[in-house]
């Protein structure tokens, strides 16, 4: 007797995606695997997204399509609603900008093993005139839990939630945090691994996920720059807090990673400051001052970078611009 195919719930949070939602939906409908429910969560879209999604409800499909509307609350709340509504044995997340290969779900199910997370490699497709698309392949097989957590914490392992198939039964009491703007996927994945004592991640060899990136405009707004830094800092600290206390070595790695990753984010955001007013507001921010103070006192930060942090917080506008420009030139020369 043929074994019954497990139902897969595909959760797709959607916000103002009228240009991309159809291709995303079709890539799920056209899967070689049939026992699928597609859960569309409309996060308060204000463009034509709703009409496109509802048209697929009216057309009918070989897969079960469900539609839910919520007042705009962000992707984390939308994903949590999808988790609660899901009826499948397994859950897969797909972003409304992206597409999946037609045999993606079938390959995930075939390779699924108890106590193991199955992951995928992906292709980056950038919405630019430059031919700078990329393929991210992960060949490593993980069989030690702390090695998985270590690589997630320091950023060597992709925490993108759409790369993995999750067991619904094992997701009890694991949700996305609504106040997290950065690394919410990584935080969710770490919780799932710790709660279920996962020791193995196996990656499929072929490319199954198409990750579409659009060019972001230059951030030249103080509130946004400060918010980026504060949100990222908050995310890193939350990850550090969920690592079990007895994992002292991993805790220390997390602390070191926090300092290095926050420093890089600060540099990326500060380098985008192009106006005198923006720099002054950044330098006056008490929250930023506190973060900089902690980084300067951190023994994991190199002395040269500490000087950079001090300089950007205290230098006049012209000196600041010159310093940032010289630093960018030196980086390109390396």
Predicted segment positions?
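N-proximal low-complexity "stem/linker" segments adjacent to membrane-targeting elements
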Residues: 1-27
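Short, acidic, metal-binding catalytic loop of nucleotide-sugar glycosyltransferases
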Residues: 26-35
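A conserved acidic beta->alpha catalytic loop
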Residues: 27, 42-51, 73, 95
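Glycine-rich, basic loop-to-helix element that forms the pyrophosphate-binding segment
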Residues: 70-86
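Short aromatic/hydrophobic "clamp" motif used to bind/position activated sugar donors
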Residues: 91
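Flexible acidic/His/Gly-enriched loops in nucleotide-sugar-dependent glycosyltransferase catalytic domains
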Residues: 101-180
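Conserved nucleotide-sugar donor-binding catalytic segment
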Residues: 145-225
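Membrane-interface aromatic/basic loop that binds lipid-linked glycans or pyrophosphate carriers
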Residues: 271-334
